[in-house]
């Protein structure tokens, strides 16, 4: 069974009944329950469609954070061959929250950077829940510089609530590391494609998302601050995150309307976790199309178009 979100309770109840009936039918060797199971399956599918047809921004935020959602390493494993990760920032340490390296996409050598949240307690702690430290962003800069030197397209996967805000990170220059990574993105003379696959939070996200083409999964979110953080600032009450989300325009649909992103990648009904392979493959199709569209554009033009793109965002919102 799936991990159900609170607003999915009607579906959870129905799918629980379906599983019980299937188990009972198997134990009794009965085929008489087939009609009842089919009826409940239709009710469950209809309920899921009804819920996902009218999702609120806060509900989309919860889907973006779903623990079973496909994460960066799953995209890398399925979309790229010969992936070779690089470790360390040549200054302090390696940061497992930020994955980076080189591989082949449909046979083409590319550079890859992404934030990894982890999928269970052990890996979440290992990857610091996707919140990168300064050494993570400095590692990203290493990869960007190498991509530019060897003229390799850069593909990034964004999935973070934000950069790690701890004292140790601040002592090691978190703000400088984020700023430098953002600036490095703007200097690259290669195609840069960024996919927001879950949460895109604050400077921790934008540091690897200043791209020629930016796409979001259908139920991902992208904002300068989390709904909880905004609620704490505006109303001194983080429990009003739902109200904040409704006013922040954090959804893929809002950001496409604002011309901040270039497109939306559809998710299976019920979210990406209900069809991981299909949504990863759809992401691969978008990456392939984007690379084709930039194949004949020279490096200086790519750089200037990217800079202009983000200047326009600042002027228009």
From Swiss-Prot:
Cleaved signal peptide residues: none
A cellular-component GO term for this protein: acetyl-CoA carboxylase complex
PROSITE patterns recorded: COA_CT_CTER
GO biological process, one term: fatty acid biosynthetic process
Catalyzed reactions per annotation: N(6)-carboxybiotinyl-L-lysyl-[protein] + acetyl-CoA = N(6)-biotinyl-L-lysyl-[protein] + malonyl-CoA
Entry EC no(s): 2.1.3.15
Involved pathway(s): Lipid metabolism; malonyl-CoA biosynthesis; malonyl-CoA from acetyl-CoA: step 1/1
Start and end residues of each CoA carboxyltransferase C-terminal domain: 40-293
Broad EC category: transferase
Keywords linked to the UniProt accession: ATP-binding, Cytoplasm, Fatty acid biosynthesis, Fatty acid metabolism, Lipid biosynthesis, Lipid metabolism, Nucleotide-binding, Transferase
Gene Ontology molecular function, alphabetical: acetyl-CoA carboxylase activity; ATP binding; carboxyl- or carbamoyltransferase activity
Subcellular location: Cytoplasm
One of the Pfam families matching this protein, by short name: ACCA
Similarity field: Belongs to the AccA family.
HAMAP family reported in the protein's UniProt record: AcetylCoA_CT_alpha
NCBIfam families for the chain: accA, AccA_sub, PRK05724.1
Function: Component of the acetyl coenzyme A carboxylase (ACC) complex. First, biotin carboxylase catalyzes the carboxylation of biotin on its carrier protein (BCCP) and then the CO(2) group is transferred by the carboxyltransferase to acetyl-CoA to form malonyl-CoA.
Subunit structure: Acetyl-CoA carboxylase is a heterohexamer composed of biotin carboxyl carrier protein (AccB), biotin carboxylase (AccC) and two subunits each of ACCase subunit alpha (AccA) and ACCase subunit beta (AccD).
Name of the protein: Acetyl-coenzyme A carboxylase carboxyl transferase subunit alpha
Organism: Brucella ovis (strain ATCC 25840 / 63/290 / NCTC 10512)
